[in-house]
C-alpha cells in the first residue's frame, strides 16, 4: 500500500499553532492588550536573540522562548517539563539532519522488524529500495531489522535515513545505517512519527504487525484530517 502524506503537512510544516502566538501578534501588530511585564519579557527575548547573532525564524523562536519561560510558573511537575525538553531537542536535531536533503524526495517504508532475509517480502523490500532510489528518491525507515533493513539494503547507506526508537527490549539499528550520520534515535513515538510523515513524499506499507498498523493508520488519519 502506497499513499502520500497531506499537502498541508508537507508544505505548511504540518504544525498547529495556538491562536495569537507571539509571531502572530507581531505580524498583526496586536500588542495593545499585553501587560507591561510581558512586553518587557519580549523585549529581553529579542535582546537575547540579537546577542546570539540572530538567524532564521526569529519571531517563532521568540515565541518558543516565551512559552518555555512560562513553564516556570505554569508547570510544577518535573516529568512534564522533561517531555517538552526532550521533544524539542529531538525535533530540532532531526530537522537539522534532514535540512541538507530538503531538495530530494523521500519515501518512508513501514514493515515488520521480524521478517527474515529468506522471505519473499524481504527481497521485495530490497528491490523496492533499489528501484525507488533509481527514480530519484531517498528511503526513510525505522532503522531496525527486517523490512526496515531490507529497504536500506536496496537503497544503500548513502540514500537512507534511519529514524530509530529507543526501547529496552529491542536491538539497535541495522548494520546498513548503524554507523551513518543520517541515523537518529527518539525517546518518544509521537516525535518519531512526526518526522516520518513530515519528511515523506510517499509512504509504503509492507506486511507487519501492530507497529506497522499503527504507523499506517496514523498516516491515514493525518491525511483524512488535513494535518
Spans of model-derived segments:
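Glycine-rich anion-binding loop/nest that anchors nucleotide
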Residues: 201-220
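Intrinsic low-complexity, disordered N-terminal segments enriched in polar/charged/small residues
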Residues: 6-9
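Low-complexity, intrinsically disordered or signal/transmembrane-proximal segments
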Residues: 20-22
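Arginine/glycine-rich "motif VI" loop of SF2 helicases in the C-terminal RecA-like domain
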Residues: 222-227
Amino acid at each position: 500500500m502506497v499513499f502520500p502524506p497531506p499537502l498541508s503537512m508537507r508544505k505548511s510544516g504540518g504544525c498547529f499553532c495556538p491562536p495569537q502566538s507571539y509571531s502572530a501578534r507581531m505580524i498583526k501588530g496586536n500588542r495593545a492588550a499585553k501587560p507591561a511585564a510581558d512586553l518587557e519579557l519580549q523585549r529581553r527575548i529579542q535582546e537575547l536573540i540579537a546577542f546570539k547573532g540572530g538567524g532564521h525564524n526569529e519571531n517563532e523562536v521568540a515565541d518558543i522562548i516565551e512559552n518555555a519561560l512560562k513553564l516556570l510558573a505554569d508547570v510544577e511537575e518535573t516529568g512534564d517539563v522533561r517531555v517538552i525538553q526532550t521533544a524539542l531537542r529531538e525535533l530540532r536535531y532531526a530537522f537539522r539532519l534532514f535540512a541538507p536533503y530538503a531538495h530530494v524526495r523521500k519515501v518512508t517504508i513501514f514493515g515488520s522488524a521480524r521478517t527474515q532475509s529468506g522471505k519473499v517480502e524481504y527481497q521485495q523490500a530490497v528491490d523496492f529500495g533499489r528501484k525507488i532510489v533509481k527514480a530519484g528518491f531517498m528511503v526513510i525507515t525505522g532503522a531496525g531489522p527486517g523490512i526496515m533493513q531490507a529497504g536500506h539494503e536496496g537503497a544503500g547507506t548513502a540514500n537512507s535515513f534511519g529514524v530509530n526508537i529507543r526501547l529496552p527490549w529491542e536491538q539497535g539499528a541495522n548494520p546498513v545505517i548503524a554507523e551513518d550520520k543520517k541515523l537518529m534515535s527518539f525517546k518518544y513515538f509521537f516525535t518519531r512519527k512526526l518526522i516520518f510523515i513530515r519528511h515523506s513524499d510517499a509512504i509504503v506499507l509492507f506486511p507487519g504487525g501492530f507497529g506497522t498498523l499503527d504507523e499506517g493508520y496514523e498516516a491515514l488519519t493525518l491525511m483524512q484530517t488535513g494535518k
